[in-house]
């Protein structure tokens, strides 16, 4: 459970950004990259404090360390230039893992106001990297609450209680593969992992699972999303929930055939059911003839379940009550 002090810190971050970054998704992205930036510096500091060496801010990237952003001789314009350059070039940092490079892919700072940036970074500085992934994950989930309204292409962030309810009903097991073909912020994937861990607990969380079993469970959990921005947010969310190498990729399940032959025991989804003007142009492998997103996603999910597989899908009521041929075929 997230404490009130941490909630206030997160709300203050959004309040600081809202004048320069009014879009909620952009606010989340700015907070996300700043937190990962800060946490990389914290991990470097932890390593050097223990007698080791820094891993992330070394070589050509040493000048971008978090501490250098707060140097007493750094002017406002220098801070904007330093931080902006660091964020935009971080995906090319050879010293950071691929996951972090993916999170920083195409990242940039959409404002140049030094006062706003200095305040924002000082607020980020209050957050510290913790090996307690539950605490970090809960904090990021609170940030993601701002995405609950409709976004591009009919995307919605599914409320946590609905996600958990569906996952509980579908009941994924520790040896089963799980997919969300429209994973967004990765809420279903994280809930599925927590459900499996809790189902294998006796005295403490996941105490009936070996380290190898936990690793396998994480490897079995997969997500696709058509939006590169949502992939980055989903990757960060999973990382902050303890996934060292989350399996979320940019992929359009309705128009690409590259992953058509992949099948899963469990599929969980709340797909974006808004069909673009002119309809979708799907490939020829679908069992129903339609250019409607809701029809195609349901058909995709049913087709990609393994024998005896199970699915939990949030669908518009039209799937049940429409009388068109494609709806009836489903």
Predicted regions and their residues:
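Short strand->helix junction
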Residues: 20, 318-321
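Conserved Class I S-adenosyl-L-methionine
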Residues: 323-330
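Non-catalytic, mostly N-terminal accessory regions of nucleic-acid modification and defense proteins
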Residues: 1-174, 247-255
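Gly-rich Lys/Arg/Thr-decorated short loops/hinges at beta-loop-alpha junctions or inter-strand turns
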Residues: 146-147, 278-283
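A short glycine-rich, Lys/Arg-flanked "PGG" loop and its adjoining helix->strand segment in the class I
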Residues: 296-307
